[in-house]
């Protein structure tokens, strides 16, 4: 029986995406995230609060490596990368790293124990694909099986993106989802009434996972997934473009986004740590967008821009 090695990193919640990326880059076959915030305000089937969940700003990110991996080298690299992230101003917190071995069948399912149904916005709830869930009236359920390499939709950057989509979409829109990952934003757009959604990701694994998640949700055959490098080569105009990726990448797509967003349309940018906020704002303003909404959760920012000649009620330019 093949064994796997498990490394758990305890970091501040704001560092979730950056640290997950570090773990994948060091050879992890997947990550699982345990975050006490996912339980805040959640209730079980009988209306009772989840019991005795201690709330903390720290989260546990568990990565899984083949038994052949030199774990000492991996942990040394992880510590170096985490120190570098902290030097860039990202709030990492007091980092601790633990490791252990586990059997393959445990590795395959271990991450699922951290993943519970979560009400993300007023209307949207994300539910693991293996969980039975009875939706309430008006509740829109996103079935998701992100695999171990993608987030579960509960990170602040994803939450703010979903909130923005819920506020903007009224039905009949064309949406472009850049860096789709698990496909959660595309699925949400479909459930919120968008007519057609185009989802792009540079990673072939993400394209496959997104399509698998789309197939889990009924009525989402209006989502078209393809490999793509941001908006390069895209000619389809859209009412809304949404991108939840790193700030350094967001600034590379603002000009193409302005070309593709229809007049009175929206650009939603998320995944922005506070230190990178001005850089993203400058790129979007230079492209011609006006800022309509700025959302903040912890160290993370999400921005909603509008393409318009009527600047009443908007900021920037």
From Swiss-Prot:
Cite the entry's keywords alphabetically: Cytoplasm, Methyltransferase, S-adenosyl-L-methionine, Transferase
Q: Where in the cell is it found?
A: Cytoplasm
- One short Pfam name that applies is PrmA
**SUPFAM superfamilies from the UniProt entry:** S-adenosyl-L-methionine-dependent methyltransferases
Q: Name one GO cellular component term.
A: cytoplasm
Q: Which CDD domains match?
A: AdoMet_MTases
Q: Which reaction does it catalyse?
A: L-lysyl-[protein] + 3 S-adenosyl-L-methionine = N(6),N(6),N(6)-trimethyl-L-lysyl-[protein] + 3 S-adenosyl-L-homocysteine + 3 H(+)
Give the protein name, as stated in the record.
Ribosomal protein L11 methyltransferase
The protein's enzyme class? transferase
Originating organism: Streptococcus pyogenes serotype M5 (strain Manfredo)
**Which residues of the sequence carry a binding annotation for S-adenosyl-L-methionine?**
158, 179, 201, 244
Q: What's this chain's function?
A: Methylates ribosomal protein L11.
For biological process, the GO terms are: methylation
Q: Which GO terms describe its molecular function?
A: protein-lysine N-methyltransferase activity
Q: Which family does it belong to?
A: Belongs to the methyltransferase superfamily. PrmA family.
Q: Which InterPro entries match?
A: Ribosomal_L11_MeTrfase_PrmA (IPR050078), Ribosomal_PrmA_MeTrfase (IPR004498), SAM-dependent_MTases_sf (IPR029063)
- Enzyme Commission code(s) on record: 2.1.1.-
């Amino acid at each position: 029986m093949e064994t796997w090695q498990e490394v758990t990193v305890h970091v501040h919640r704001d560092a979730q995406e950056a640290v997950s990326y570090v773990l994948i880059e060091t050879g992890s076959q997947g990550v699982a995230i345990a975050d006490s915030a996912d339980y805040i305000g959640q209730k079980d089937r009988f209306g009772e609060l989840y019991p005795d969940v201690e709330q903390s700003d720290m989260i546990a990110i568990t990565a899984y490596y083949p038994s052949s991996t030199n774990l000492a080298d991996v942990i040394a690299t992880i510590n170096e990368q985490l120190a570098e992230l902290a030097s860039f101003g990202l709030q990492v917190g007091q980092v601790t790293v633990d490791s252990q071995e586990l059997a393959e069948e445990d590795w395959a399912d271990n991450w699922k124990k951290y993943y519970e149904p979560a009400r993300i916005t007023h209307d949207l709830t994300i539910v693991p694909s293996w969980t039975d869930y009875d939706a309430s009236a008006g509740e829109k359920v996103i079935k998701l099986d992100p695999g171990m390499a993608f987030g579960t939709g509960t990170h602040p950057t994803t939450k703010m993106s979903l909130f923005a989509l819920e506020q903007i979409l009224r039905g009949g829109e064309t949406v472009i989802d850049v860096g789709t990952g698990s496909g959660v934003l595309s699925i949400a757009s479909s459930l919120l009434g968008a007519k057609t959604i185009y989802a792009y990701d540079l990673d072939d694994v993400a394209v496959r996972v997104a399509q698998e998640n789309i197939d889990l949700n009924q009525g989402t055959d209006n989502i078209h997934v393809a490999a793509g490098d941001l908006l390069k080569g895209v000619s389809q105009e859209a009412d809304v473009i949404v991108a939840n990726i790193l700030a350094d990448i967001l600034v590379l797509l603002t000009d193409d986004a302005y070309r593709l967003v229809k007049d009175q349309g929206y650009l939603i940018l998320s995944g922005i740590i506070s230190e990178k906020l001005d850089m993203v704002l400058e790129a979007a303003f230079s492209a011609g967008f006006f800022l309509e909404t700025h959302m903040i959760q912890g160290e993370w920012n999400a921005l909603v821009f509008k393409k318009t000649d009527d600047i009443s009620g908007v900021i920037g330019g």
